[in-house]
Amino acid sequence: MNVGRYQIQETLGTGANSRVVRAYDPMIDRGVAIKLFSPEIARGEARAKFLREARVVGKLSHPAIVTLHDMGIEESTMTPYLVMELVEGQPLERIIAKGSVPFSTACAWAAHVANALAAAHHNAVIHGDVKPANILITTDNRVKLTDFGMSRLTSHQGVDSSLFGTPAYWCPEQIHGRAQDARSDVFSLGVVLYEMLTGISPFAGDSLQAVCNNILSSSPQRPSHVNSSIPALLDDIVTACLCKDPQRRMPTAETMAEQLFPFARRKPALASAAIVEPNQRSRVSRLLRSA
């Protein structure tokens, strides 16, 4: 089976409205990943929306963002598709299903994702669906953020009450049906970081309503209370990311990366003493005093 000039080889994954396949591009002589969407997206207003959002993704260029090579609609089957960089590795979702990861590793991975988000935010793009399934860890331990399919140009975003994405990673403003911005991605990445550090979800519930209620009103245990190897200052960073009020949340993904990278450079035994620089401590303290 072919899609355009691309030769389909195997299915890599399947979602609710799409599937990802491994393919070969004979023109460039390289492997690629192709995301195939439902034909419904190729009709009417949805077609224009698909093409518009694909162009949004195509604007992004960052080492930790999966590169978009091509896009189109296979007219014979009316199948929209995105041709992307083929990443050899596994989703973070599969890794944390086995439990927590060392906090220096968790901080490194989260910091790289935060830098990728910062690059997107500087281009007026929010991801809108940051979760472990959309974070790939390569075979050489690099991080790749994928699936900007839910992203929006912030310059065009108004109040939208529709709930897309995965409930466990929703931010409070999304549940309330309010406009989202870059701080919404920070909250979702904070949830991912919490899961990496502790091996559990901060807002777990036995129903959609319970999850939403927990996101809106409960305060999860501090990570160090779940995993004693985690230093207290890292607790503070996670708390700042998960602040329910966007005005008091960790202000930018760039700031989040700056706060996390020092932990990533230290071994666990040294990390609690690593973040003692006055300017670093004062930045976190200011965030927490306002939370």
Regions found by a protein language model. Name each.
Residues 71:
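Activation-segment/catalytic-loop signature of the eukaryotic protein kinase fold
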Residues 115-125:
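Protein kinase catalytic-loop region centered on the HRD/HxD motif
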Residues 168-269:
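C-terminal lobe helix-coil module of Hanks-type protein kinase domains
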